[in-house]
UniProtKB/Swiss-Prot annotation:
Protein name per Swiss-Prot or TrEMBL: Pseudoazurin
Domain Plastocyanin-like: 30-118
Domain of life: Bacteria
Biological source species: Methylorubrum extorquens (strain ATCC 14718 / DSM 1338 / JCM 2805 / NCIMB 9133 / AM1) (Methylobacterium extorquens)
Organism classification: Bacteria, Pseudomonadati, Pseudomonadota, Alphaproteobacteria, Hyphomicrobiales
Main location as per UniProt: periplasm
Keyword annotations from UniProtKB, A to Z: Copper, Electron transport, Metal-binding, Periplasm, Signal, Transport
GO molecular function: copper ion binding; electron transfer activity
Matches recorded under InterPro entries: Amicyanin/Pseudoazurin, BlueCu_1, BlueCu_1_BS, Copper_blue_Plastocyanin, Cupredoxin, Pseudoazurin
């Protein structure tokens, strides 16, 4: 009987611990490609949805790419991101909202991506109002349409 009580107590403790620990954050891989879904010079995927605390591992599958925050396309207080060309980088997202990223060497060719963190879209209209060249805007418009 004493062993049974000890097992019940241990099981109860294990359940209590499991339900109070935070869920592990996810890490999503995003490839930076010379050619892929959507054409030449693309992020794959170009639209990523995350929970606060999740991360993206940006992979320069084809060399010559980096990731940089597009000015005006991040929530207030979010860290500015600028990675080294050709280097992998992991970026953690704690602030909810919409983020726009570019590959600086290929921005004029429309190499952009959107990241949506959490449920808040407070900066969506501000992000949509940022001016881009025609090719970049052509790539962003369908991405924005998916997060309305």
């Amino acid at each position: 009987m004493m062993i049974f009580r000890a097992l019940i107590a241990a099981a109860t403790l294990a359940i209590a611990i499991a339900t109070t620990l935070p869920a592990a954050a996810d890490e999503v891989a995003v490839k930076m490609l010379n050619s892929g879904p959507g054409g030449m010079m693309v992020f794959d995927p170009a639209l990523v949805r995350l929970k606060p605390g999740d991360s993206i591992k940006f992979l320069p599958t084809d060399k010559g790419h980096n990731v940089e925050t597009i000015k005006g396309m991040a929530p207030d207080g979010a860290d500015y991101v600028k990675t080294t060309v050709g280097q992998e980088a992991v970026v953690k997202f704690d602030k909810e909202g919409v983020y726009g990223f570019k590959c600086a060497p290929h921005y004029m060719m429309g190499m952009v991506a959107l990241v949506v963190v959490g449920d808040k879209r407070d900066n969506l209209e501000a992000a949509k109002s940022v001016q881009h060249n025609k090719l970049t805007q052509k790539r962003l418009d369908p991405l924005f349409a998916q997060i309305q």
